Structure formats: C-alpha cells, structure tokens
Amino acid sequence: MNDLKKSPLLILDFGSQYTQLIARRVREMGVYCEIYPYNINHEQFKKLNPCGVILSGGPSTVTHDANPRAPQWLFESDLPLLGICYGMQTMAVQLGGQVHSSTLREFGYAELRLHGHSQLLSNIEDRTAMDGSALLDVWMSHGDKVTELPPGFKVICETRNAPIAGMADESRQMYGLQFHPEVTHTLQGLRILQRFVVDICKASTDWTPEHIIDEAINKIREQVGTEKVLLGLSGGVDSSVVAALLHRAIGEQLVCVFVDTGLLRLNEAEQVLSMFGRHMGIRIIAVNAEDKFLTALKGVTCPEEKRKIIGRTFIEVFDEEAQKLTDIKWLAQGTIYPDVIESAATSTNDAAVVIKSHHNVGGLPDTLNLKLLEPIRELFKDEVRQVGLELGLPHDMVYRHPFPGPGLGVRILAEVKKEYADILRKADAIFIEELHNAQLYHKISQAFAVFLPVKSVGVMGDGRRYDYVICLRAVETVDFMTAHWSQLPWDFLGKVSNRIINEVEGVSRVTYDISGKPPATIEWE
C-alpha cells in the first residue's frame, strides 16, 4: 500500500477558530491533510511535498504591516493555493493588490452572486437570480476587504457589501474566498472545498478507516518489533481505540493498566475489564486505588487543585505498577491530533490563558525510561470513532459521551467524599439510562449529573428531609468550543427527577442547567 501521507494537503494556520474545522472537512473527503503555522520554514515545506495549500482565516488585519504574512516563496511554488478570509486578504496584498478596513462589515449570512466561470465555483449554486446568475448562501466574518485585485486575478463572486468576495488567477491555480466554506452555514461549502482539494489539487482520497488501520498496524510493528508495550486504559474512546489497535497489531506484547480511582461512572470498571480482558483477551492489570485517591483529595475544594491531585495520584499509581514490569520498553498514549495542534499553538503563543489544566498534559515521569508510542496522534476525534468501529468496538462504547479525566472529582462541587461520589454515580446512571430509553442520548453531545454541596428541604411521605441537590446538564455542540443547552422535554426531565429523588438516598431536589457556552463552560469545574 502507498504511504497515505505521501503528498498531503497543507493548511497554514493564521489563528482562525475554524482552522481545525477546515482540516476535518478535508479529512471527510478521504484526503490526508496537516495543519502548520503560517510561518512554516521552506525546508520543512519541501519535505512534506504537499499537493496544495489552504491559507486559513485569522483574527488579525492585513492593514498592519507587523501582522502575519504567508511565506513569499509560497506564491512561487506552482502549487494550487486557496486563501480563506484573512488568507485571501494576505494573498491579495502580498501579490500586489490592496485591502482596506471597511465600515460595512459582514458577520453572518450573506447572499453571494457568482461572476462568470471559474473552475472553483462553476456549477455550484443554491438558486438562480432573475437575471440567471448563480446565488449561494454563505457565512461571512470580516471587517477588512479586498479593494483592488492583484495582477492576473479576476473577480469570481460578490456580495452587496463586498464587490470582491472571491478572486481567482486560473493560470496559477490561486483562489481567494472572503467567506468561510468550512462552516455548515455555507450550504455548498463542502462541495467548494472538494472542488479545490480533489479536482484542482488532485489529492489522493485513500484516507479511509481501513487504510488508516492497515498503515497504523504496519508502523506499530515496524517500531515495536518484539518488545512489550504498556498502556493506561481508562475506558474512554481514545485509550479504548489504542488498546484495540495495539492488540490487533502486536497481540500479547500489549499490557494494560486500569486504575479504578473511585471516581468512575457506575459499573465502569466491570465493563472495561469485561470488554477488554475477558472478551478481547487483552492482559489487564486492574488496580483499585479508591482509598488512595480519596485520601489525597481530603479537605480539597479548589477545582484546579483537585485536577492536579488526581493527575499526580494517577501518575504515582501507574508508575508503581509499571516499575513491577521489568520487560516493558514502550509507553502507549491516546494522544489525538487536536492535542498535538493545541500543544504546538500554546508553546508558541505567549498570550495563551489556561482556563482549566488538562489532566493528560505533562505525561508520565521520566523515571519510567520508556519510548513513547502514539498510534492515533494524527486523527481527529470523529476519525478515532470510525477507526474504533472498524476495529469491532461496540457502537455504544465508541460514541459514548465525553467523560473528564478527573472523573466525578470535578462533578462534585465540594470536597470529594465517597458518600458524595456514590450519590452522584447513581443519579448520573439514572439520567443516562433514561436518555437511552427515550432515544435522546445520541441526539445530544454530552449529558451528566453534578453534585451540589448544598442541602434542601424536601418531603417524603409524612416526613421532612434535608438532603443534597443534583443538577442535570445536557448540551448540544459541533466542536465543544461553543455549546447550547439541550431543550429536553419537560415530561422527560420530570421522570428523571422523580426517579433520582425516589431511588437515590440523600437527594431531595433535582435542577436543570440552562447555561450555554459561553458564558458557562460545559463542565462545572
């Protein structure tokens, strides 16, 4: 099989919130692509041997000379280029055109009118105007606009406020679009990107789950040989897919460590051990470390401190087990492509602000002295799920809602106690069970219960109760960067509330969180 990454499409990132979305759209076409900073060096670029380049949008303005520019040599590379929003503007300025800040800004939907014929947009339309012009509904997000074309370019589309909403130099296969084809609001956006990537760049469309698995297995076997690999198995999607992939590639050379922190979902430990140990035959070392974690968390209420303690304690437990295994040479991790991109961005961005520390960042201690194996580091989350299904993992496991690494520790808004964890575990399980029963689970992106450290008066029979409050949270999102609270049916919420209050000892009241992101985050801590 040919190397799937032999001639990738490159996306040069100017800081757009949509850059990863561009890459995901390209991958959906079966095309391998990678994201690099806009100032990629020439030698690295040549080694990658790309089939074409997309210049992303960004928050800066090209009217300031100090702001980011594409490498000038890029425009002499003879490769097809597509500039989106800021990418189009910097292309225009660097090739001799002009861009000015506009008082007529465009944010949101706009009607786009196509001009004549262009290879990029021909025969792509939402409807036709009275004069026969093709019209598209697109998503705009810009203040600056191109006011003068570079030499050799022509206008290929316009909006009411942007006479040059798209430009093309067909002879050099250079294109610019002021709108965002990568977002779903641009109805024909995927077709436009496909026209550039597949038809103009002639990109290979072999990036499929089957081929990804074949190439990953070959690479794992080549790297590892006959040596043994250690994996921390959590039961989450990423580590589960890594376990299944490694098991197929190297069989009994894989050893997994599963740490029960006492902060997992109801019956989660049993499910993981049954699925991977008994059914798949993977060697798993199970460690019940509940007491160790609860002792470490005693008296701690600060969310950030809880995260750090849970991460540190996990490393201690994992390290202790790893030291007992003398013949292990490799450590496998479930790093995925967004982790790689975000780590690179944070390392070069002095202005980055840590909202919450990530439990995976920092890794395991150097004393392990193991070589690192990251077999899914080039995959987005949706690709990880597709690979998981192809490897035979159950749909319910692969499409399970996200669960934070610190587990219930950051869903208990107080000191973490066993009593609180047991209450929350049962309440959460009822909520998830009823979502499945009502066929709502896969219609929302994430749902969970939160334990609130306040007591509320309730009435049971003839007696009064003074017990804890549970809050339910359900959100809908595409990328988890923003989210809407789910408008679940009132009768459904009433049923869940009734079950929790009646079946979970210690709960007298259930509430529902109707906060979006922003301003709230999805998790409470």
From Swiss-Prot:
UniProt name for this protein: GMP synthase [glutamine-hydrolyzing]
SUPFAM superfamilies documented for this protein: Adenine nucleotide alpha hydrolases-like, Class I glutamine amidotransferase-like, GMP synthetase C-terminal dimerisation domain
Keywords: ATP-binding, Glutamine amidotransferase, GMP biosynthesis, Ligase, Nucleotide-binding, Purine biosynthesis
Listed PANTHER family: GMP SYNTHASE [GLUTAMINE-HYDROLYZING] (PTHR11922:SF2), GMP SYNTHASE-RELATED (PTHR11922)
UniProt-listed InterPro entries: Class_I_gatase-like (IPR029062), GATASE (IPR017926), GMP_synth_C (IPR001674), GMP_synth_GATase (IPR004739), GMP_synthase (IPR022955), GMPS_ATP_PPase_dom (IPR025777), NAD/GMP_synthase (IPR022310), Rossmann-like_a/b/a_fold (IPR014729)
UniProt organism field: Legionella pneumophila (strain Lens)
Binding site for ATP: S234, G235, G236, V237, D238, S239, S240
CDD domains per record: GATase1_GMP_Synthase, GMP_synthase_C
Subunit comment: Homodimer.
